[in-house]
Amino acid sequence: MSSQIRQNYSTEVEAAVNRLVNMQLRASYTYLSLGFYFDRDDVALEGVGHFFRELAKEKREGAERLLKLQNQRGGRALFLDVQKPSQDEWGKTQDAMEAALLVEKNLNQALLDLHGLASARGDPHICDFLENHFLDEEVKLIKKMGDHLTNLRRLAGPQAGLGEYLFERLTLKHD
């Protein structure tokens, strides 16, 4: 059944929004895996775990925002299978942060692609929505992860375990 409210909403943009929802949910799933990996008793980096669990929550909320947009525009939400994280054991914080940075760069590219598609299809509402709710936050998160990686690399070396512990305590400290 077609929507009575649908206007100037191309099927290509609708499909791209659904793909982006899936990517957000996959990112959330990955961050949930990371968050609970670092909270294990044999890893015990609670601050790192908290950082990734907060990201999981943010990505799930982003997916929900996109689903609300889909309904507001008269599109139909298609729930695709969410692929499991690429691994179960994440290693050191630096390895995990590198994996997370790759996830964010892929998400950012998908957002940019959707923005370009919406612009080409004459859909300023989608462009405005992405600019106000996603693009700036994504760039800030990529910068933050890049900064964390720089600091983790500085701390690597013969005492890498101590460096990782100090990074977790001093950078990712939370209440």
Swiss-Prot record:
The modification N-acetylserine is found at residue 2. Oligomer of 24 subunits. There are two types of subunits: L (light) chain and H (heavy) chain. The major chain can be light or heavy, depending on the species and tissue type. The functional molecule forms a roughly spherical shell with a diameter of 12 nm and contains a central cavity into which the insoluble mineral iron core is deposited. Interacts with NCOA4. Stores iron in a soluble, non-toxic, readily available form. Important for iron homeostasis. Iron is taken up in the ferrous form and deposited as ferric hydroxides after oxidation. Also plays a role in delivery of iron to cells. Mediates iron uptake in capsule cells of the developing kidney. Delivery to lysosomes by the cargo receptor NCOA4 for autophagic degradation and release or iron. One of its GO terms (biological process) is iron ion transport. Pfam families: Ferritin. This is Ferritin light chain. Keywords: Acetylation, Cytoplasm, Cytoplasmic vesicle, Iron, Iron storage, Lysosome, Metal-binding. Signal peptide: none annotated. GO terms for cellular component: autolysosome; autophagosome; cytoplasm; cytoplasmic vesicle; ferritin complex. GO terms for molecular function: ferric iron binding; ferrous iron binding; iron ion binding. Fe cation binds at residues 54, 58, 61, 64. Belongs to the ferritin family. Its main location: cytoplasm. It is found in: Cytoplasmic vesicle, Autophagosome; Cytoplasm; Autolysosome. It comes from the Eukaryota. Residues 7-156 form the Ferritin-like diiron domain.
